[in-house]
Amino acid sequence: MKIMFISLGCDKNLVDSEVMLGLLRDRGHMLTNDENEAEVIVINTCSFIHDAREESVETILEMAKLKENGKCRLLIVGGCLAEKYKDEIFKEIPEVDAVLGTTAYDRICQVIDEATEGKRPMAFESIDRLPKGHVRRVITTGGYFSYLKIAEGCDKHCTYCIIPKLRGSYRSVPLEDILTDARELAAAGVKELNIVAQETTMWGKDIYGEKRFPMLLKKLCQVEGIEWIRILYCYPEEITDELIQVMAEEPKICHYLDLPIQHGSDAILKRMGRRTSRKELEEIIGKLRTAMPDIALRTTLITGFPGETEKDHEELMDFVEKMDFDRLGVFTYSPEEGTPAQKMEGQIPEEQKEERRDDLMALQQGISEENSRKMIGRTLQVLVEGRIPEEDVYVGRTYRDAPDVDGYIFLGA
């Protein structure tokens, strides 16, 4: 059968989609990117915030039309939206033939078989399950970079976050499975590994009784063919001196860190259930910059959190200005059903959230422009990813640019 995948949401979800594609390829199915040719359409959904849920539902409804107007015979929904709203999906969207949860993606072949027989399967496993066995996945990112997922789930339980309920507790992928994945990616021509998980720096704690992320990084640096290793999703309180030392000493590890801090006001950090104070964040960032003066730091913030006063917003603006982040993204707070923050007093109007977000982005724009000017005259290695024929230029990234979220370098032909 011809099967098409639509992967929504984060890069961790994309890795799950690539694993499912690998299973289907090994089963003999044909893969296609043409929705008008697909006999089976699988949508791997996101449900992290309200906007993500809307996008997921809109995509399902759009693809459902192809059961009447195209060749589509089966419409299958997986991922976080399916995990949370499986009954509602079946009830409200009768065109959906099967749903599978976040820890049951390795059952995709079975689900398609059952749906082909006219059943309407619901494939779900324990939320704390980690699918076993390695699968050679299908690379969908273009060939030169890929995401390497090293863990599933999260134990942090921030007051605004639904992820532990959708993805379960923290489970590390075994070392040999990670290394096998990395070697296969390298053999396929991948030059850059982007390390992802809900939280990367906790890796190994559930296997060894202690964090072993620095050890894992050293092992990955030994994989032949890999030139860059980029670390994403690092919780600041888990950054140790050992990790900083490994980053500084290993030439393959990019001097780049994705460090989600969420806020700069101690009062809001406490309400969020975060585990670092503003002072501690400043100390951690100071250590990173002392060890690696050329490090590029990316962070994400949430504005409009319940109880956020004008003073809290000003403290966050001051923090952003002083920390001089190279890359920064801002989300307006999205109340999630079943989280403590949803029930907190002091909910902020949407208009005010957006105004505060715009303040932060305007501030960061000036910081980013100044940091870009500082790069003039420097010589940097660029990973060239493609060419724009009509403009006769090549497109690539430096160590300072993570795929999908940061900028690009344009090179004259």
Protein language model features and the residues they cover:
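Short glycine-enriched, charge-decorated loop/helix-capping segments at active-site entrances
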Residues: S47-F48, R167-G168, I207-E210, K270-T276, ...
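Short flexible coil/turn linkers enriched for glycine and charged/polar residues
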Residues: T140-Y144, C154-K156, I253, H263, ...
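Proteins enriched for Cys/Gly/acidic motifs involved in redox and nucleic-acid/cofactor modification
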Residues: M1-W203, E242, L257, E280-T290, ...
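Short, hinge-like loop/turn segments at secondary-structure boundaries
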Residues: I93-P94, A115-G118, K211-F213, M247-A248, ...
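Terminal RNA-binding accessory module
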Residues: K343-A413
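Conserved SAM/AdoMet-binding glycine-rich loop
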Residues: L75-I76, K84, I89, A187-E310
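Contiguous mid-protein beta-loop-alpha structural module that forms a pocket-lining wall or clamp
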Residues: E308, K322-F325
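Conserved, mostly hydrophobic/aromatic
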Residues: I178, I195, I231, L259, ...
